[in-house]
């Protein structure tokens, strides 16, 4: 079965990442879903941005956690709110992969509560998967709303002396009752994918822009590929 194609931060190869323009482009080229990152402003508004500060995307020194939503408004469409994003695309029946970004334990509960509230307000439980690299955050999602699907995200271990084994990855995902795993492409080993599927986990792989991954994903049984260039990946599918 062909994998779903999910636009990483929208169609970020064609438009600025995590902007409405990037998400519209992903939809225009036929992506099956969009992936985006969510952080919390100082006044508790979930906004769509990957980095903790505006330095890379807007060349400004401010941290998102130090700004209010109104203070972000002059940036035009650079940083949309989660509410705005869900409002615009709730009728598209897209898969929405919402990656929670929190820099401290203190941010965890308010960010998860605010995000889950909006998911419910927009009646998007069937379309949204909430992912995070921080496993305790996924536990909080489950506690707040057990019906919202979650994905345990895994990147390559920083230390090669302690690589992430298949057993460790699956054990961590199961420990937080995750619905899915999102694997760095170098972790997408045949045995791991097979074990994840046997455990009933949905499997996504990130971030891949090489069209040869389409056939690899089909052969391995990978459910979705997260890509910066959904147009190129869809052309190969």
Task: Describe every region a protein language model picked out.
Residues 1-237:
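Phosphate-group recognition and catalysis centered on beta-loop-alpha active-site segments
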